[in-house]
Design a protein with these regions (language model features):
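Helix-turn-helix DNA-binding module
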Residues: 130, 134, 138, 146-163
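Sigma70-family region 2
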Residues: 15, 55-70, 89-91
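Internal acidic/polar
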Residues: 3-6, 93-118
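C-terminal edge and immediately downstream basic/flexible tail or linker adjoining helix-turn-helix-like DNA-binding
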Residues: 2-4, 12-13, 94-97, 155-156, ...
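Structural recognition of an alpha-helix C-terminal capping motif at a helix-to-coil junction
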Residues: 35, 49-56, 69-81
């Protein structure tokens, strides 16, 4: 799901505490937020707990919080901070070498490009993304799958925009290198 498709109007939640809109927001963002939290805390169960804590806190403090301009960015930043606090409270340091135990399937509407890419190629692409170093993979997913700008990803991860740019270059080179034999075979 791209940033524009996620940027639904959640103002009635922030203004009125609309439970239905809150549930819609949770449903729309939870899979991506769990995936992101898992990249920080290192396992699915803790990631689920972190995301639940964020949504509980948002619900409890809805009347006191100013509605954010960018709900997606706000939620990712809240998950990042909650995950880091979770690690600190549990006597663990953040590790970017943690294995991601969860795969979140992003439901994309089919378009002509999706139809042309067969299942085997999608498996190769997913394997290439998963083989990236953890920080590089995290940046790639935020930018390419979640639709964050380089600047937003840099701010969210407390990195420079140049670092995000370098990591994206590395990610794309590694993915293309991994896919090279597959693409040559498929289209020759």
């Amino acid at each position: 799901m791209t940033m524009s498709s996620k940027a639904a109007d959640y103002s009635s939640f922030w203004a009125l505490g609309d439970l239905a809109v809150f549930k819609q927001m949770m449903k729309a963002f939870s899979p991506s937020l769990r995936y992101f939290a898992c990249s920080i805390v290192g396992n699915e169960a803790e990631a689920e707990e972190v995301v639940a804590d964020v949504f509980i806190k948002i619900w409890q403090q809805r009347a006191q919080v100013t509605p954010p301009d960018n709900v997606q960015y706000y939620l990712f930043k809240a998950v990042k901070n909650t995950a880091l606090n979770y690690l600190k409270q549990n006597g663990r340091r953040q590790t970017h070498l943690a294995a991601w135990e969860v795969e979140v399937s992003h439901h994309h509407a089919q378009n002509p490009e999706d139809i042309l890419i067969n299942k085997e190629q999608l498996d190769h692409i997913q394997a290439a993304i998963q083989s990236l170093p953890p920080r590089c993979r995290q940046i790639f997913i935020l930018v390419k799958e979640e639709g964050f700008s380089y600047e937003q990803a840099a701010t969210l991860l407390d990195l420079s925009k140049a670092t995000v740019n370098v990591q994206m270059t590395i990610a794309l080179k590694k993915i293309w290198a991994a896919l090279g034999p597959t693409l040559k075979y498929s289209y020759s």
